[in-house]
Amino acid sequence: LSLMDHGGIYRTLLSVHMKRPWEDVVAFAKAAPRRIIPTVRIKGRGYHRGPRNKYFDRLEGQLGSDPFGAMAEVHVWHDSDGGKYHEIRIDFDDELFLAAFDAAKGKDWPLIVHMEFAALSFIGKRDYMDKLETFLRSNQDHPVVMIHMAQLEEPDVRRLLAAHYNLHFMTSHASPFYQSGGKPFINMINDGKFKPQWKKLILEYPDRFVFALDNVFSKFWMPDLYLDKMKMWWNVASDLPNDVAQAFAHGNAERLWKLTAKPDGVMKAPHEAMKALGPVTGYSANAAHR
């Protein structure tokens, strides 16, 4: 919470990773119910490795816990990046995907879909794009959010937004911070602002973009990196008209996930918060965890 305060973040949709039990995120949310939204974990044992019943058991257990208010990303295509990660390649009619989608529909939660289009061949991209659009047309009454901008550049995103009014995009990993790794994430930002084509598109579709970070690994929660990202994103958002910036930063997420609106004036920009609050406190501030 101290890290969020310093970064100007009022609320976080939080899930668990690796061997951490999902009950932990429920406990975090109970301790700070206005700030932490516990988010159902999809990936993990049974989804991309091991017996499938492990996934179904985990999903059922989480869905039976009242505090959950969102569902984390559902992987359809996840590249291994040369063997560094588990590759996931399933279709929209796979029982794993459909179980998550049915659960999201039952809870009236947006479905976050993980697709890495830039890591596919030309034919692979074409085939998965056809499958995605078929799914979107078949479920026009349910909001779908593509995490990491689906690794798509502006022309593809523009076409998809025009064709599918239930489609939204999350800006996680779509920044200069992710251009030196092995995965081909797009970069929406140049010189501390949205690139012109992206700013134009956001202004045309102000209700379809959701600010997000995807803090998968512990290093992403370390104060220096986290706050550098948040300083950048606050500056980027400040180049938008205020109503569009507010929608991008939190309003669209509040609408899609049916969250209470962020109270006015409760958060400061990172450069102001860091002066007012002093050092970050809590677990992530301990250098031993870096």
Placement of each model-derived feature along the sequence:
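Catalytic pocket-lining loop regions of alpha/beta-barrel enzymes
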Residues: 30, 34, 46, 87-211
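Mid-to-C-terminal alpha-helical segments outside catalytic/metal-binding sites
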Residues: 1-16, 203-208, 216-290
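Well-ordered, non-membrane alpha-helical segments in soluble/globular domains
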Residues: 1, 22, 52-56, 93-97, ...
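Catalytic metal-binding/acid-base residues of hydrolase active sites
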Residues: 17-19, 43, 75-77, 116-118, ...
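Structural recognition of the beta-strand scaffold that forms the well-ordered cores
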Residues: 10-16, 37-41, 69-73, 110-113, ...
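Mid-domain alpha/beta scaffold segments of enzyme catalytic cores
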Residues: 1-99, 103
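Active-site gating loops and adjacent loop-to-helix segments of metal-dependent hydrolytic enzymes
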Residues: 72, 78, 166-178, 225-233, ...
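Short catalytic/ligand-binding loop motif for oxyanion handling, primarily in non-cytosolic enzymes
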Residues: 21-23, 78-82, 119-122, 153-155, ...
